[in-house]
Amino acid sequence: FDAALIVDEAHATGIFGKSGRGLVHELGLCNQVFARIITFGKGMGTHGAAVLGSEQLRTYLINFSRSFIYTTASSFLSHLAVKVAYEFLKKHDHQTMIHERIKQFKIKVNSAINLLPSNSTIQIILVPGNTQAREAAIKIQQAGFDVKAILSPTVAIGTERLRICLHNHNSIDEINKLCTTINQIL
């Protein structure tokens, strides 16, 4: 097909790979993808993004990307924040902590619940039907948890879901309480 693979690592940067370099890096596939889009706003806790690719791609984007041509460079403070975030990941056990929380969530959710396979901080539970997904999300929110329903037409009919985002600032006790709530409601 003469196609090129571009990988969006928005939810992998800071979470997967050595020092948070992403899932493509963790899998050793950096030289097999055309470009990687990494963001600094999720796992890195700052803002901005970068496109990683070949020198040819870099030259192309500099010369033909209208939004790049007509914008100003990011500030020194933005660059410093990203640098400090990467240094933090090298010095702290952030990745082990978040993966422990993900594992705890997956263990504690009832096996009868339709939890999609994921090692990411984003966990998805299928709750078919807009009404059913919305009502489940509301009940979980009323218990104090920020769980969102993703409804059709955003997703295909019959694949409506709950989106759960896990963070390092969630304690194991909070995750256990969330799972207990989910198990009771679903």
Task: State where each predicted segment sits.
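Active-site PLP attachment segment
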Residues: 25-60
